[in-house]
């Protein structure tokens, strides 16, 4: 069997993207890094996004950290998801930065969250810390769009959280708010502050926040599609 090669340009169809992702299934991160001419770090402490970057290279992703999807021409977002030996997610999944100001007129249909989750290529990767990074294997990909029920619940969560932001209740939001979607601080250090709306409508400084999918959502999604018991 010939070895796979990284795509040198963005895939032109979903079929091409999925076929390339399927070729990576079963390879270790170390093998894929070596084939792409990259060095595998010892761990992810200083390279938290390394797995995502590696797979973006292999799949010809174009967006980088821009607000558009990773495969903008296809409207597809790439999400790697670390899983345990039973295929269950080990952590929540970052979706996008939460906008804390300038939210008048924003709706679920026009939100960054919905745009990012409209069509997702999920790639599970072994994530247990007992497995050295280079030895962790890539799993089978899943090209997914939310069904009606998932979209409804995500919308309800988003609307609840955005209402709290707009009404100046940002400091009251905890990770427990939302059934599937949560908002958490997203900052490497506590000095990286951003503007938000305070309880009396005044401008305040607070930690940047991000939208994350809770593990109960991604766990059910993977179980349904991969028939995990």
UniProtKB/Swiss-Prot annotation:
GO terms for biological process: DNA modification; mismatch repair. GO terms for molecular function: DNA binding; endonuclease activity. Its main location: cytoplasm. It comes from the Bacteria. It is found in: Cytoplasm. The keyword Nuclease applies. SMART domains: MutH (SM00927). InterPro entries: DNA_mismatch_repair_MutH, DNA_rep_MutH/RE_typeII_Sau3AI, DNA_rep_MutH/T2_RE_sf, Restrct_endonuc-II-like. Coiled coil: none annotated. Keywords: Cytoplasm, DNA damage, DNA repair, Endonuclease, Hydrolase, Nuclease. This is DNA mismatch repair protein MutH. The lineage of its organism: Bacteria, Pseudomonadati, Pseudomonadota, Gammaproteobacteria, Enterobacterales. The gene is mutH.
């Amino acid at each position: 069997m010939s070895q796979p090669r990284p795509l040198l340009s963005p895939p032109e169809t979903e079929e091409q993207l999925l076929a390339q992702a399927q070729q990576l299934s079963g390879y270790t991160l170390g093998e894929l890094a070596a084939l792409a001419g990259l060095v595998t770090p010892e761990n992810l402490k200083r390279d938290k996004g390394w797995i995502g970057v590696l797979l973006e290279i292999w799949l010809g992703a174009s967006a980088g950290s821009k607000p558009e999807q990773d495969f903008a021409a296809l409207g597809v977002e790439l999400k790697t998801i670390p899983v345990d030996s039973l295929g269950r997610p080990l952590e929540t999944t970052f979706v996008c930065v939460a906008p804390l100001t300038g939210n008048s007129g924003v709706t679920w249909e026009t939100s960054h969250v919905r745009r990012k989750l409209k069509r997702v290529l999920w790639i599970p990767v072994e994530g247990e810390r007992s497995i050295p990074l280079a030895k962790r294997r890539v799993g089978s990909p899943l090209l997914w769009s939310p069904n009606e029920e998932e979209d409804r619940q995500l919308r309800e969560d988003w609307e609840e959280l955005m209402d709290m932001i707009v009404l100046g209740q940002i400091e009251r939001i905890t990770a427990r708010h939302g059934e599937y979607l949560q908002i958490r601080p997203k900052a490497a250090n506590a000095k990286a502050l951003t503007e938000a709306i305070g309880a009396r409508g005044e401008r305040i400084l607070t930690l940047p926040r991000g939208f994350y999918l809770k593990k109960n959502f991604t766990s059910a999604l993977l179980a349904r599609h991969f028939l995990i018991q």
